[in-house]
């Protein structure tokens, strides 16, 4: 595969970075909190896997992440805004519809997009997010304090320590991430989730203690399928082979 080129476009005042590789039916990939398009999708082999399956593979850096604009006002990370960034990318590329797959926070953004603009989403794949789309507001706000701490050694909360270490590993802007976690903790109600009318696959690792049950969420979304990713936690589910195989099957079978 040739070198992957990062491209950019403006969504209002925010410059968003993305990659656009291959030909075929388009799929847009939306990464999780404190990650980026490379860490979530390129390095674990998703871009290669999808291209080999004949898919045009598009992945963006969410606002505040990767090579996209860093923002420090929590209000600018509302999930409605982040979901609309995906719609803006579709507009920029001249795509009326695409399959959309998100992981963790990216799955939340994908669900919000599917509800607000279902006509733009051919199918939605939610990885690393189950019933916590409904039952809570995403990752706990204590993670913001962990990101703002002087060093990882100052963080005692296990989940906060994990995300602080991950943010350092991905060389992220920790203050932008702290603003993101404070501003993007919106949920959908059961009645709002029931309005989603696109084919949906919900995949969660059996050792994931962050996402919540995929089956509980699937029961609320008409026609949704749930998938267990065996033996994987929140971080290790992303590149799992069984997850990839299930996604490829789902893409082949969806209308």
Show where each model-derived region lies:
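Conserved HGGG/HGGXW glycine-rich cap/lid loop of the alpha/beta-hydrolase fold
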Residues: 12-69
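Hydrophobic, aromatic-rich cap/lid helix
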Residues: 164-189
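Conserved alpha/beta-hydrolase "acid-adjacent" motif
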Residues: 209-214
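Short beta-strand/loop motif that positions the catalytic acidic residue
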Residues: 196, 202-204
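Conserved alpha/beta-hydrolase "nucleophile elbow" surrounding the catalytic nucleophile
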Residues: 98, 102-107
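Active-site loop/oxyanion-hole signature of alpha/beta-hydrolase fold enzymes
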Residues: 42, 49-52, 59-99
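Flexible "cap/lid" loop of the alpha/beta hydrolase fold
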Residues: 108-116, 120-151
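Catalytic active-site module of serine/aspartate enzymes centered on a nucleophile-bearing elbow/loop
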Residues: 229-255
């Amino acid at each position: 595969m040739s070198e992957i080129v990062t491209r950019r476009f403006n969504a209002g005042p925010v410059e968003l970075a993305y990659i656009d590789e291959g030909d075929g039916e388009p799929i847009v990939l939306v990464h999780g909190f404190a990650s980026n398009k490379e860490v979530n999708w390129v390095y674990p082999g998703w871009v290669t896997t999808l291209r080999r399956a004949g898919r045009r593979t598009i992945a963006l850096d969410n606002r505040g992440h990767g090579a996209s604009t860093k923002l420090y006002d929590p209000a600018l990370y509302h999930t409605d805004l982040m979901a609309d960034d995906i719609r803006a990318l579709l507009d920029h590329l001249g795509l009326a519809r695409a399959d959309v797959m998100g992981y963790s926070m990216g799955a939340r953004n994908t669900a919000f997009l599917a509800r607000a603009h279902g006509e733009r989403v051919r199918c939605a794949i939610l990885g690393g997010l189950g019933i916590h789309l409904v039952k809570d507001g995403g990752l706990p706000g204590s993670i913001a304090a962990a990101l703002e701490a002087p060093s990882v050694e100052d963080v005692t909360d296990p989940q906060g320590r994990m995300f602080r270490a991950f943010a350092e590993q991905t060389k992220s802007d920790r203050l932008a991430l702290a603003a993101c976690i404070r501003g993007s903790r919106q949920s959908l109600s059961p009645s709002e989730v029931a309005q989603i009318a696109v084919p949906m696959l919900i995949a969660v690792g059996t050792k994931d203690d962050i996402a919540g049950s995929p089956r509980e969420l699937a029961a609320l979304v008409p026609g949704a399928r749930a998938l267990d990713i065996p033996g994987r936690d929140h971080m290790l589910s992303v590149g799992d082979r069984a997850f990839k195989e299930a996604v490829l099957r789902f893409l082949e079978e969806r209308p």
